Regions:
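Short amphipathic alpha-helical signal-transduction/dimerization elements
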Residues: 1-2, 94, 116, 167
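Surface-exposed helix-capping loop/turn segments at secondary-structure junctions
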Residues: 2-11, 119-120, 145-146, 170
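ATP/Mg2+ or Mg2+-diphosphate-binding catalytic cores
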Residues: 22-32, 135-170
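Short amphipathic alpha-helical segments and their helix-coil junctions
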Residues: 38-39, 67-71, 105-123, 162-169
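Active-site acidic catalytic loop and adjacent metal/ATP-binding pocket
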Residues: 39-84
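Active-site activation/catalytic loop segments of kinase-like enzymes and analogous catalytic loops
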Residues: 83-119, 129-148
Length: 170
């Protein structure tokens, strides 16, 4: 249903690989302990013809099931690429930070089979590493600035999972 919502008036998020990667760079530059992993190369990809109202934190904000499934907690809505919401659902770091298990390969395959949108699957495959780089940067930064050792540990675990998720696709 959110796909038919008019996104006019909401903040606009980055839409190109280079811009998304640059946002990750901005997080990593603040960190003392930078990962040894390499920055993905930007892939040329056109901006979607239709921009969407996106949630930006889907994974842990779905309640209900089937036709009653709802997105709650709309703290950071934006105008952007629907693939960003797909990313926040599939990302291992988002799941870890939400204190949920990472999705299995079988669950991810089931997601794509159920969605039945090969066009989005292709687009996502081009953007995934950039989204993962940006969120890995966020996790690295948060792991360094927070005081709670348990939460910092969760961010470090999320960082390592996200870098692996990025590498699996680069």
């Amino acid at each position: 249903r959110k796909e038919v919502a008019d996104p006019t008036g909401f903040r606009r998020v980055s839409l190109t690989c280079e811009d998304i990667l640059s946002e990750g760079d901005e997080f990593f530059v603040r960190c003392k302990n930078k990962p040894k992993e390499f920055r993905p190369h930007p892939i040329a990809i056109s901006v979607p013809e239709k921009l969407s109202l996106i949630h930006t934190d889907v994974g842990v904000n779905l309640v209900g099931s089937g036709g009653g499934l709802r997105l709650i907690d709309w703290q950071c809505p934006a105008v952007g690429d629907i693939c960003e919401d797909i990313y926040s659902f599939l990302s291992p770091a988002f799941q870890i930070l939400g204190e949920r298990p990472q999705l299995s390969g079988e669950q991810i395959k089931s997601f794509w089979d159920t969605l039945d949108r090969p066009d989005l699957a292709r687009r996502y495959s081009k953007l995934r590493a950039a989204f993962a780089w940006r969120f890995a940067g966020y996790c690295a930064w948060r792991a360094e600035i927070l005081d709670d050792t348990d939460i910092c540990g969760r961010y470090r675990f999320a960082l390592s999972a996200e870098l692996k998720y990025m590498e699996d696709f680069v």
